[in-house]
Amino acid sequence: MWSWDISYCPSEVRGQHWYLYLIMDIYSRKIVAWEIHEAESGELAKKLIDRALLRERCWQNPLVLHSDNGAPMTSYTLKARLAELGMLMSHSRPRVSNDNPYSESLFKTLKYCPKWPAKGFASLTAVRKWMLLFEQAYNEEHLHSGINFVTPAQWHQGVDAKLLAKREAVYERAKSLNPRRWSGDTRNWEVAGAVSLNPGKLQEIEFNKQAA
């Protein structure tokens, strides 16, 4: 399942901003595609979805795409394209603020990054350059607490189990050498299982059908 959303990227000029379109994989937390635009539209969202599918090579594997109920997310243009692709569409429930938690959490991580410019960006090009660096650092270097401190890229590539097994072996050896330093079990380095948007809460998923 992918989650996507749009967030503001402020300019140095008061009242001006750009829109960050961002798609992530909720299982691995990996950023799979993003773009910066001067407007919100279903057409721009459609193009980003196409690019994400091409980049991840999953044209033949229909996904579920989750979002809130913003205008670009519910536009006919996007719905029609998802119908062509055979993708399912999931939306946040009306008046429920935490139904898109993964995208919201990622935007918080992004905007609380120490290198986020407090006074805004100088230009559209500057925003894009910043996002390129952030994507690289987040996907390839950031040890994500939600996936047991491996990087999103490692989780996405399926190498997390081997890494976590090595960590567990290191901890067990340390415990055997110095048992007095350990009052209980070592840290749990098991691979995390399935994830969900909001455990225990029904989520509406619809299959998009093109209008005749």
Region locations from a protein language model:
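Charged DNA-binding/catalytic regions of mobile-element recombinases
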Residues: M1-A212
